[in-house]
Design a protein with these regions (language model features):
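Polysaccharide-binding and catalytic clefts of secreted carbohydrate-active enzymes
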Residues: 1-84, 95-112
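Alpha-helical structural signal in soluble globular domains
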Residues: 3-4, 76, 80-84, 112-120, ...
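A generic short-segment signal for beta-strand/edge and adjacent turn/coil regions
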Residues: 59-60, 91-95, 160-163
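Active-site-proximal loop/turn and secondary-structure-junction residues that shape catalytic pockets
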Residues: 18-22, 94-98, 130, 165, ...
């Protein structure tokens, strides 16, 4: 697909989209298939649930090792692409509600690895539409700040993906999505994204830049009486 893009005249860009270690609904993190166990020494410590504030040092060390393995795999993808497309822009997309779950404060060890820190990628893309569409503005602010602190990308090297509306019956969600887009632009991100075209056309969503210009409150002119 990179070859197709460059043949069409586009600059090479490669997005690593939402890579993470999957977590089951009951909080078990999926680190125990045969390949993963071999990578972690054969008998990695059990983590019954990642949704805990009392993980042991050994459990945290396993999560750190999982993060290093994840970072290594994403770096290998980028390096492979750049062998054929030198200078390719690399982007990492991080879905904040999953990887920065407040109930699992140590999940970031595995799913927001320090190996992703700047300048591992050219652009950090942040997405959090589950928070946006439920009006959880505070979670967005906290999540963005936490991602910036952990990975160190300046806002000028960030993109923000504010969301989409799957069902026509939920079209009211466009309002908080639009507001989140405006907030990201005020933060100074390099680009914002709303998707997808079928839903945008279905609901007639349109973004307007209607902010008023600054005006002088009065003209200080002396008129003859």
């Amino acid at each position: 697909f990179m070859a197709l893009a460059t043949l069409a005249g586009h600059a090479p860009r490669f997005q690593v989209g939402e890579p993470w270690w999957w977590t089951m609904p009951d909080g078990r993190i999926c680190l125990y298939d045969d390949a993963a166990k071999a990578a972690f020494g054969g008998t990695p410590v059990e983590i019954p649930t990642i949704r805990s504030t009392t993980l042991t040092a050994a459990q945290k060390a396993l999560l750190d090792a999982a993060g290093a393995l994840l970072a290594g795999s994403t770096a290998a993808l980028v390096n492979a692409v750049r062998l054929d497309h030198p200078g390719c822009e690399a982007l990492i997309l991080v879905y904040l509600p999953t990887v920065l779950d407040a109930a699992a404060p140590d999940a970031k060890r595995a799913n927001v690895p320090l190996g992703w820190a700047s300048p591992a990628f050219d652009v950090l893309q942040l997405e959090d539409y589950d928070w946006v569409t439920t009006g959880n503005v505070g979670a967005t602010a906290h999540g963005v700040a936490a991602a910036e602190a952990r990975l160190g990308y300046p806002v000028s090297k960030q993109h923000y993906l504010s969301g989409f509306v799957l069902l026509e019956t939920d079209r009211a969600q466009w309002r908080p999505i639009d507001a989140a887009t405006d907030a990201a632009r005020k933060r100074g991100v390099a680009a914002t994204f709303i998707w997808a075209l079928p839903q945008v056309l279905r609901d007639g969503y349109t973004h307007f830049d209607l902010a008023e210009d600054d005006v002088q409150a009065f003209d200080d002119v002396s008129f003859p009486l």
